[in-house]
Design a protein with these regions (language model features):
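Conserved glycine-rich cofactor-binding loop
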Residues: 12-13
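Substrate-binding pocket helix/loop in short-chain dehydrogenase/reductase
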Residues: 91-92, 96-104, 211
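Active-site helix of classical SDR
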Residues: 115, 154, 162
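Residue(s) in the substrate-gating loop at a strand-loop-helix junction
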Residues: 137
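Short C-terminal tail/terminal secondary-structure segment
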Residues: 142, 219, 231, 236, ...
């Protein structure tokens, strides 16, 4: 495989799809993974060099299987993007153990073991200048997000995990960073608009106006806004960046 190889989890739609497309534009061969196998195949079919693999990130064995297939088929792995994530809005006092466990299983455990599988493969393949990118959230930088306490906890965890990984994996020539999106126009956001509207007793359109008002640059974020930053983190220009959490949110939250 002459092209660089990237794995993107949760790439069947939304931010993950945009990341897969951006990396393809940057001449990567992309492994498009998703729990929805058909969605992964549909995305892979739009890219010049890609293949699709079904992957449930809540099952560490699935992530290991993806990494092993890359070692066997492509025989190189340059970039791993742990993007798969979920959210469901509820008041803190209404979040039960089942809801909490599901959110943490996907958003934190899923990132932990997916990125671990990628790192192991990179080390075994002796990859030089390897990159791992964990998709976090603006909610990882500001806990004052309503109706998402379990989600906030999971994304704060991703930031801590990213720093720990960056420190431990630096001797293996692996850089690890996270990206923190804000209010992104995705299928997930459509559901979030409806949930927040119901919880607040207002219309989804009013919630959308609130989100835009809270974003100084005056619009909702696009998946491509996130993907471009991920692309930068895979480039030579970012070779001395590791352990960082880069906010991409139009100013909705500022460090």
């Amino acid at each position: 495989m002459d092209k660089k190889v990237a794995v993107v989890t949760g790439a069947g739609s939304g931010i993950g799809r945009a990341i897969a497309t951006e990396l393809s534009y940057r001449d990567f061969h992309v492994i498009v993974t998703d729990l929805n196998e058909q969605a992964a195949k549909d995305v892979a079919a739009t890219l010049p060099s890609a293949r699709a693999v079904k992957c449930d990130v809540t099952l560490p064995t699935d992530s290991v299987a993806v990494a092993n297939s890359v070692k066997e088929i492509e025989k190189r792995l340059d970039v791993w993007v742990s993007n798969a994530g979920v959210s469901k809005m509820a008041k803190f006092l209404d979040i039960d153990e089942k809801m909490y466990d599901f959110t943490l299983d996907v958003n934190l455990k899923g990132v932990f073991f997916a990125s671990q599988a990628g790192a192991r493969a990179m080390i075994e393949l002796k990859t030089k200048d390897a990159r791992i990118i964990n998709i976090a959230s603006m909610a990882a930088k500001a806990g004052r997000v309503p109706f998402l306490a379990d989600y906030v906890a999971s994304k704060f965890g991703v930031l801590g995990l990213t720093q720990a990984m960056a420190y431990e994996l630096a001797p293996n020539d692996i850089r690890v960073n996270s990206v923190c999106p804000g209010f992104v126009s995705t299928p997930m956001q459509v559901r979030e608009l409806a949930w927040e509207a119901d919880l607040r007793g207002i219309s989804p359109e009013d919630v959308k106006k609130m989100w835009i008002k809270d974003t100084p640059l005056g619009r909702l974020e696009l998946p491509e806004d996130v993907a471009k930053v991920v692309g930068f983190l895979t480039s030579k220009d970012s070779e001395f960046i590791t352990g960082e959490a880069i906010a991409v949110n139009g100013g909705a939250f500022m460090d």
